Amino acid sequence: MAKTLSRSTASCVAKRFFSTSNAVASPSPLPSHLISRRFSPTIFHAVGYIPALTRFTTIRTRMDRSGGSYSPLKSGSNFSDRPPTEMAPLFPGCDYEHWLIVMEKPGGENAQKQQMIDCYVQTLAKIVGSEEEARKKIYNVSCERYFGFGCEIDEETSNKLEGLPGVLFVLPDSYVDPEFKDYGAELFVNGEVVPRPPERQRRMVELTNQRGSDKPKYHDRIRNVRRRENMR
């Protein structure tokens, strides 16, 4: 049974995995107060997906609630079309309206890509009411290095994904490429996988590889997460 991570829990998981490659190879255990006996098997099972996951979109939190619509193909480098936020963003795009849903591999070892995508759509449809609506809300999918999808839903709706079959983590998403407001993985527009222009794809690969070697600033991230929680 999967458990949706709270903001504070997500930040602690992020602190564990936002480390150098050596730290990923020999990770320290999660704090015991975050893992109950009931949920520890699920969390440790999901942990196996995180190193690959962070190559696309790392587990991050941010303190603002941005509005506006998201279109990775139409968005440019200008952030002025986004409304004012509560505080300066730590991770652009992490607005608690875009969520990364990490899943177990759907359909078994021999599942085809389209079968996996259908499973993602069906999973979200259980929450939003129909597969047609689910296709509109999913903005990216991953069927290779990790399994899951990104969807644009509010925080209350994201909580309803907790415990659905196959769901491991429900995490706030953030941009891999802030210049183009791009969350990474494969773009999913109007129910179909859409390729990026070649130059955008090359840029995405470079950013993805770079992110694997970046050393995060844990203390600033955790301090601002706590600040956000104190404001609630």
UniProtKB/Swiss-Prot annotation:
A cellular-component GO term for this protein: mitochondrion
Key words, A-Z: Mitochondrion, mRNA processing, Transit peptide
Sequence segments annotated as region (Disordered): 208-232
Cell compartments where the protein resides: Mitochondrion
Family: Belongs to the MORF family.
Basic and acidic residues compositional bias, start-end: 212-232
Pfam families, per the entry: MORF_dom (PF21864)
Span of chain positions assigned to the transit peptide in the UniProt entry: 1-67
Subunit text: Heterodimers with MORF8/RIP1, MORF3/RIP3, MORF6/RIP6, MORF7/RIP7 and MORF9/RIP9.
Molecular function GO terms recorded: mRNA binding; protein dimerization activity; protein homodimerization activity
Superkingdom per UniProt: Eukaryota
Primary location recorded for the protein, binned into one broad class: mitochondrion
Swiss-Prot/TrEMBL GO biological process terms: cytidine to uridine editing; mitochondrial mRNA modification; mRNA processing
Name under which the protein is recorded: Multiple organellar RNA editing factor 6, mitochondrial
